[in-house]
Amino acid sequence: MSGWPRIYYKLLNLPLSILVKSKSIPADPAPELGLDTSRPIMYVLPYNSKADLLTLRAQCLAHDLPDPLEPLEIDGMLLPRYVFIHGGPRVFTYYTPKEESIKLFHDYLDLHRSNPNLDVQMVPVSVMFGRAPGREKGEVNPPLRMLNGVQKFFAVLWLGRDSFVRFSPSVSLRRMADEHGTDKTIAQKLARVARMHFARQRLAAVGPRLPARQDLFNKLLASRAIAKAVEDEAHSKKISHEKAQQNAIALMEEIAANFSYEMIRLTDRILGFTWNRLYQGINVHNAERVRQLAHDGHELVYVPCHRSHMDYLLLSYVLYHQGLVPPHIAAGINLNFWPAGPIFRRLGAFFIRRTFKGNKLYSTVFREYLGELFSRGYSVEYFVEGGRSRTGRLLDPKTGTLSMTIQAMLRGGTRPITLIPIYIGYEHVMEVGTYAKELRGATKEKESLPQMLRGLSKLRNLGQGYVNFGEPMPLMTYLNQHVPDWRESIDPIEAVRPAWLTPTVNNIAADLMVRINNAGAANAMNLCCTALLASRQRSLTREQLTEQLNCYLDLMRNVPYSTDSTVPSASASELIDHALQMNKFEVEKDTIGDIIILPREQAVLMTYYRNNIAHMLVLPSLMAAIVTQHRHISRDVLMEHVNVLYPMLKAELFLRWDRDELPDVIDALANEMQRQGLITLQDDELHINPSHSRTLQLLAAGARETLQRYAITFWLLSANPSINRGTLEKESRTVAQRLSVLHGINAPEFFDKAVFSSLVLTLRDEGYISDSGDAEPAETMKVYQLLAELITSDVRLTIESATQGEG
């Protein structure tokens, strides 16, 4: 580029460099989209806009991609590196430039015909200034329409700092030429497909128009389901039809979101400022798979785990910056207090009560509102656990909203619904101190403005945040596979509950929890906490801690928990340095070196972070515990022991493997432990390696408390085979609390009611307890003896003496 064009672009770039602060999606286009910068790259934009072109150029230069203003030279021929699909509108409408996109596409394809080694990567790029979807009434022009020069000037002036450059996966022109030819009709088809691509991309980024709230309420009131519920309300409560209708409208006011794009923009500015000061980074993985689903027209339902009230804001912020529409979020009614309630409502929150029981009108209004969101094409987010996890582990799922999601499909007419499991991880959760108090029996404090201000005042260095998108679950595909005749239950009017609904919803919920855990994120904090809590003194020298972290990191990198899980790329030493900056640990220095200590008062709180990744390490920890106890053991006997205990672990921690997959996993882990020098393999036997016994023992300690808990329940069951399930849960908790006090077990989940409830249900499913309540004493004693070998003798004596004392 030379002469006047260079001067023109430089002059135009001056105001743009001040007014425009754009963000690239994805954040690092070349590696994330697999672009090969050694091969020619050309850019395709939807319509002629010099502002878009210069905004694209700034992002290309920032990410070491070719400059779109520099032409491509191929076989001595100079071609523009960018193509505008459409000339775009002009201020003076009588002047319409001739479109050149088809000619340029044809020129590029023709070069591939004459040069068999040429392979140009065509990268579609859209530049967006603002993403307001608009309202259903009152706007003649659609949002994100093509703008003429004057309109574009005002868009840049007002929305320049809310702009995104969206790079799409490249298309190989070599493949196009080889498979479809190079004539002009193929060039026309390419331009037509590109137009459709950009139209879909705009819809994925902006979403459908927002309804006028009153119009939405009127439509809901007119639905047959709500009309019938209003009649039933009037009849059952002996009130007038008008009064019952007012009750329904009041419920809609309580439930419905009041989405505002301007509030999204304002909050994005505030959160961007806040995150940069509180977090050292927010790590996002696998967002491209979600963008592709949105582009393909799927109705997206985000199903994250629930760690903190921060989840609502963090996930919406991340989705917005990934070029996706912030979802409508199901939030607990406890958050509907001033000023948080009105703010959350304008950010897309709709409010849900803890229980629907006994209120048919409420359940009908809520179900119809949710169905309306789906039918209009809005993305939705809800927390399938129902509440925030107090222990750091996933809670058993609550299936009410999930059931309504499938019922929405059974009304027909919705786009394909796809569930997106999401793992959210933190290095600091602001509520963790409150969680520990609640687990010890304190009453949950009601959410309020003073409580919110107290929480905000405590926000300091929060370390890193993690948002990992798990494997999507297309509901239609799932139902086709597991309930082939599900379409026979479609009823566009009534909410139906076919016989298959409840078991199917339960299976989907369990599968979602597994997929959330599959996307787990190991980080400096949870790895250091895992190692220090494994030490009985909660302290290790820096060398020991480094060695232990290397053990965890190598296990996770060389035998990954799943393809969606993430492990830090930093070294063990760098992770320790980062964790020490979080001010959770103490360091004692002496002449020999540093000792890193987890203070007693912090130990209980730090179990939360350890539990975030317990599922990723529990199997190697169990193997280490078995090998440590036996000193040497054959693979077959090791496999038998793991097989006995695995169903309990799988149910408790939502582990991913089926029983028939265990042999391969155990072999891979055993080989990795041998590679690390933790064990030696001789004649198909696993032996302890004495020179690395401490590392193996610390690895084994990761399963210690879980095995102690199982030992309690199996001993109680063996001692009293006719004990009923409720009493078994209660007595297990009592013994666990006693064990916790006598042996200094710091984990509050050690005697958590939900953990024992889940365990007892698994024992029934595995046949250790019959439906009549009686246990199989021979089987339970056999398992107890296996567990008794894996726990220390003093803990075993406490368990056995506690139950004898009760007898």
Swiss-Prot record:
Q: What are the protein's GO molecular function terms?
A: glycerol-3-phosphate O-acyltransferase activity
Top-level taxonomic group: Bacteria
Cystine pairs annotated here are: none
Which transformation does this protein catalyse, written as a reaction?
sn-glycerol 3-phosphate + an acyl-CoA = a 1-acyl-sn-glycero-3-phosphate + CoA
* Topology term for the membrane: Peripheral membrane protein
What EC number is given for this enzyme? 2.3.1.15
Question: Which pathway does this chain act in?
Answer: Phospholipid metabolism; CDP-diacylglycerol biosynthesis; CDP-diacylglycerol from sn-glycerol 3-phosphate: step 1/3
Family membership, please give it: Belongs to the GPAT/DAPAT family.
Q: Which HAMAP family match?
A: Glyc3P_acyltrans
Recorded protein name is Glycerol-3-phosphate acyltransferase
